[in-house]
Swiss-Prot record:
Belongs to the MnmG family. GO terms for molecular function: flavin adenine dinucleotide binding. The gene is mnmG. It is found in: Cytoplasm. NAD(+) binds at residues 273-287. Its cofactor is FAD. It comes from the Bacteria. It comes from Pseudomonas putida (strain ATCC 700007 / DSM 6899 / JCM 31910 / BCRC 17059 / LMG 24140 / F1). This is tRNA uridine 5-carboxymethylaminomethyl modification enzyme MnmG. FAD binds at G13, G14, G15, H16, A17, G18. NAD-binding protein involved in the addition of a carboxymethylaminomethyl (cmnm) group at the wobble position (U34) of certain tRNAs, forming tRNA-cmnm(5)s(2)U34. GO terms for cellular component: cytosol. Homodimer. Heterotetramer of two MnmE and two MnmG subunits. GO terms for biological process: tRNA methylation; tRNA wobble uridine modification. Keywords: Cytoplasm, FAD, Flavoprotein, NAD, tRNA processing.
Length: 630
């Protein structure tokens, strides 16, 4: 057979996790196979047509900083861009983009098809080849065998997928796609903890049947933001508005009177749904005192009339869906193009994973995306990139890598998953990170791109752009530091006139910029400086104004890092540690944390227990620093 059967890395699944995993592995120079059940659905946005949002855009920027495709695909397909929390500090600002679903998918496919070292093959995976607790390859639906020392599973909602509309259900990976039944059975044979989760989607509406005149228009931002560090607004297609309407008492009455026909409330669905993206049934049940809920009407694309009514995800029967949709202002005559539905699927307890996202029990088998209990394109893409990177590192005989919690939201995501596990679909928020001021959207490249270059993820073009930005920041900060403004001079008076800030003595421009009332653009205008790259200017201003807070956070990180990175021996027997309660011994034995820091975040493990473990390690002489290569 001319088609190769042996690869370094095999990725199963072509969604957001799978595409980033395959691209990362191939960028690192290893021979990579991407197996997908349908080439036409590579990069498909299964749920809402949007990328980013609070916490999520930080992940997108980090994927981008490591050379991933999601941000650039968003810039090329985004039909509306907004910065959320714009009036708050830079740590919690977040970019969100509506994407043209068809363009996004086409861009991702183009990137995949033009990636060296990457083979794409359309076949479902039905079996894993495992020998002596090591993965050796996969078997496809038609019996083809492909071999690799590293396999990345990114199965999304396809493992044992069951679609519910009302009290009727049928097998499916998502609407229109078959589930992975054979692989689900095979996975349940492995010594891994498995559970069921649920997610859902709203009915899609024909925009020609909607009255926008009674809704509130929500235009995008001007100037238009960009998502990728390599992107620009000229990449964006035509920009459009979203619209806002609301449910009402009649809507809630329709839903409440039909809860007995809901698969969620009649006990048909066993899986737990996402807390932060609840169905409309959940909303009116959990928030019974609320008179209305917002519904965001989002366009699916520039060349379709289809709309996505964000906020009314439902699995109620179709007749109820039609009635509740038509009870909403502006949608009294709405035509439903596709019914909403819920889907149940298998996921595996992420506490059975290492930091590399490799399973603890099967060597070379990596998990990424919804199989780990997460929800969202961004969370999936971040895990996919990390799993693909570590699968490639394993193939190259190099140490694995995962950023720490103080280095990236990706690090927060992975640490939360493998330490705490999850009983419901996990979504990223900025509130999950202790070091938000350092882990900003705007500095993701400064935090991660150098590491990405070292790993082999960053091409020459991106590296040159990054170096120019980094060096530009250093030059401008030095210029501001060495440029002085004195009272009663032309420059000094210009500053006073511009900001109403009296100068009692001479100041460097850097000192002046640290003042809350002085902004960078105004300071340059007043003192006659030259315009510089906007990304450089943004970094200089943020770093200067928040320098004191950032320094304090860095000091805190340095203090904690010594114990945080102390590695726990793989063979440690917690029952031999004097003073540990049986409960804590059990928790530690079950989770098998890799570091003392990870152990400290296991619920129920007390600071006193950590001290006892540290004493035990010192006695053994086994404590050594983990350079995040577990």
């Amino acid at each position: 057979m001319d088609f190769p059967s042996r690869f370094d890395v095999i990725v199963i699944g072509g969604g957001h996790a799978g595409t980033e995993a395959a691209l990362a592995s191939a960028r690192m120079g290893v021979k990579t196979l991407l197996l997908t059940h349908n080439v036409e659905t590579l990069g498909h946005m299964s749920c809402n047509p949007a990328i980013g949002g609070i916490g999520k855009s930080h992940l997108v920027k980090e994927i981008d900083a490591l050379g991933g495709a999601m941000a650039l695909a968003t810039d090329k397909s985004g039909i509306q861009f907004r910065v959320l929390n714009n009036r708050k500090g830079p740590a919690v600002r977040a970019t969100r983009a509506q994407a043209d679903r068809a363009i996004y998918k086409a861009v991702v496919r183009e990137i995949l098809e033009n990636q060296p070292n990457l083979w794409i093959f359309q076949q479902s995976c039905d079996d894993l080849i495992v020998e002596q607790d090591q993965v050796k390859g996969v078997v496809t639906q038609m019996g083809l065998r492909f071999f690799a020392e590293s396999v990345v599973l990114t199965t999304g909602t396809f493992l044992g997928g069951l679609i519910h509309i009302g009290l009727q259900n049928h097998s499916g990976g998502r609407a229109g796609d078959p589930p992975s039944i054979a692989l689900a059975h095979r996975m349940r044979e492995l010594p891994l903890r498995v559970g069921r989760l649920k997610t859902g989607t709203p009915p899609r509406i024909d925009g020609r049947s909607v009255d926008f005149s009674v809704m509130t228009e929500q235009p995008g931002d001007t100037p238009i933001p960009v998502m990728s560090f390599m992107g620009n607004a000229e990449m964006h297609p035509r920009q459009v508005s979203c619209w806002i309407t609301h449910t009402n008492a009649r809507t809630h009455e329709i839903i409440a009177s039909n809860l007995d026909r809901s698969p969620m409330y009649s006990g048909v669905i066993e899986g737990v749904g996402p807390r932060y993206c609840p169905s409309i049934e959940d909303k009116i049940h959990r928030f019974a005192d609320k008179e209305s809920h917002q519904v965001f009407i989002e366009p699916e694309g520039l060349n379709t009339h289809e709309l996505y009514p964000n906020g009314i995800s439902t699995s109620l029967p179709f007749d109820v869906q039609l009635e509740l949709v038509r009870s909403i202002r502006g949608m009294e005559n709405a035509h439903i193009v596709r019914p909403g539905y819920a889907i149940e699927y298998d996921y595996f307890d992420p506490r059975d994973l290492k930091y590399s996202l490799e399973t603890k029990v099967i060597g070379g088998l990596f998990f990424a995306g919804q199989i780990n209990g997460t929800t969202g394109y961004e969370e999936a893409g971040a895990q996919g990139l990390l799993a693909g990177t570590n699968a490639a590192l394993r193939a190259q005989g190099r140490d694995s890598w995962c950023p720490r919690r103080d280095e990236a939201y990706i690090g927060v995501l992975v640490d939360d998953l493998i330490t705490l596990g999850t009983q419901e679909p996990y979504r990223m928020f900025t509130s999950r990170a202790e070091y938000r001021l350092i882990l900003r959207e705007d500095n993701a490249d400064l935090r991660l791109t150098e590491k990405g270059r070292e790993l082999g993820l960053i091409d020459d073009l991106r590296w040159a752009a990054f170096c120019a930005k980094r060096d530009g920041i250093e030059r401008e900060e030095q210029r501001l530091k060495s440029t002085w403004v004195r009272p009663n001079t032309e420059q000094g008076q210009a500053v006073v006139d511009k900001f109403g800030t009296p100068l009692s003595h001479e100041y460097s421009l850097l000192n002046l910029l640290a003042r809350p009332e002085i902004d960078y653009a105004g300071l340059i205008e007043a003192t006659g400086g030259e315009a510089i790259d906007p990304q450089v200017a943004e970094q200089v201003e943020i770093r200067t104004k928040y320098a004191g807070y950032i320094d304090r956070q860095q000091d805190e990180i340095a203090r904690l890092r010594a114990s945080e990175d102390t590695r726990l021996p793989v063979d440690i027997d917690y029952t031999t540690i004097s003073g540990l309660s049986k409960e804590i011994q059990g928790k530690l034995s079950q989770t098998r944390p890799e570091t003392l820091g990870q152990a400290s975040r296991i619920p129920g493990v007390t600071p006193a227990a950590i001290s006892l473990m540290l004493i035990h390690l010192k006695k053994r002489g086994a404590g050594r620093e983990l350079e995040q290569s577990a």
